């Protein structure tokens, strides 16, 4: 009943995925990015389900995790395309906020090395409580930080997918041999 290498590795990968998703969730909350917040929340739930299935020898839960990783990879590929403006997508749209606010990625103003300052608004613009800012000196632009986050998610998901398939195979083989 010891922990086999595949199960332990999958538990480690799921734990790492959860930590990375929680980090991403925090920064998406700071930027009011509602679509990624919802996606991250679902991802965290399914990763917990995958962890439970791995620890409790429940292959159906691991299958659900495996199916979700395919959707998660597709979502992160979309985010990469969105921030790199591939295929007619534009990072300047309100798509990530479900078109309910003008917020953007938190990294846009707070990236490494970024210095921002308030810029006076043109008198013709009525901004309410919003203001113009100018961001300069960023070591890495915010869209590339978002792409790096998504690439890490894709890498972890692909590794998790492979190990989940292996663990499902091992668990079902053990069930078949015990009957």
Curated annotation (Swiss-Prot):
Membrane topology recorded in Swiss-Prot or TrEMBL: Multi-pass membrane protein
Keyword Cell membrane: yes
Keyword Cell membrane recorded: yes
Gene Ontology CC annotation, any one: plasma membrane
InterPro entries linked to this entry: Na/K-Atpase_Interacting (IPR008516)
Domain of life: Eukaryota
TM segment ranges: 5-22, 35-55, 62-82, 151-171
GO BP term (any one): regulation of sodium ion transport
Keywords associated with the record: Cell membrane, Membrane, Transmembrane, Transmembrane helix
Compartment(s) of residence: Cell membrane
The protein's assembly and partners: Interacts with atp1b1 C-terminus.
Family designation: Belongs to the NKAIN family.
UniProt protein name: Sodium/potassium-transporting ATPase subunit beta-1-interacting protein 3
